[in-house]
Structure formats: C-alpha cells, structure tokens
C-alpha cells in the first residue's frame, strides 16, 4: 500500500533562502554546494511522503501557527501542512535568531 504523496511548495522567501545558502557555499566549495542542494531536495521529497517527519518548534509562537521544522546539516527547513500541500516558509541556519524572521 503506497502512501498518499503531498505537494511541496516553496514560498518565494524560502526559494531566496535556498539560493543564498547555495551561492554562499559555492563561493568557496562548489562541490559542497551541489551536495547540499541535493540533500535539501532529497529531504523535501521525503517530506512529501512523510509530512509529519519534522519536529514541532519549542517556540510557542511558531508552534501555535502549526509550523514544523526538519534539520538538514546546520539548517532548519520550516514548513506548514495545509491539506495535501506542504508549504516551505524558510530555510535558515540553526544559529540564526530565526524567530525574528517570521
């Protein structure tokens, strides 16, 4: 029995996050940037099959808005689930003060 697959949509700001991260890494290590991009894409595919895989944030403000996040290396993919669609809101380095960016 196959699971129902969810659609994954990156919001514009998440697309910008992704592009900035990959460009930053590529400036010094192009092969590492390519590997990172592939890892993000694979994790998004995984989310499409298991949307509740990510954790609920400990920050009450984000949890109350039904955000979840998935850790990929040092980065956090923040997303929400609405019906059969996963909306990726941000892709941020875990050391950032990410709460101020929502």
Question: Could you say what each language-model-derived stretch is?
Answer:
Residues 1-39:
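Arg/Lys-rich, positively charged N-terminal/basic patches that mediate binding to nucleic acids
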Residues 22, 41-44, 89-92:
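Conserved protein kinase catalytic domain
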Residues 30, 45, 49-53, 75, ...:
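Generic structural signal for secondary-structure transition and capping sites
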Residues 32-37, 41-43, 47-50, 61, ...:
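Amphipathic, hydrophobic secondary-structure cores in small proteins
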Residues 54-83:
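Basic/aromatic recognition patch in beta-strand/loop cores that engages polyanionic ligands
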Residues 72-102:
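Enriched for short, Lys/Arg-rich terminal
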């Amino acid at each position: 029995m196959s699971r129902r697959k969810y659609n994954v949509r990156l919001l514009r700001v998440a697309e910008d996050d992704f592009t900035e991260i990959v460009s930053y890494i590529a400036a010094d290590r192009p092969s590492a940037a390519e590997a990172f991009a592939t890892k993000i894409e694979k994790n998004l595919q995984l989310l499409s099959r298991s949307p509740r895989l990510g954790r609920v944030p400990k920050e009450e403000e984000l949890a109350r808005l039904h955000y979840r996040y998935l850790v990929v290396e040092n980065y956090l993919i923040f997303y929400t689930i609405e019906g059969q669609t996963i909306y990726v809101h941000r892709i941020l380095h875990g050391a950032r003060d990410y709460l101020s960016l929502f």
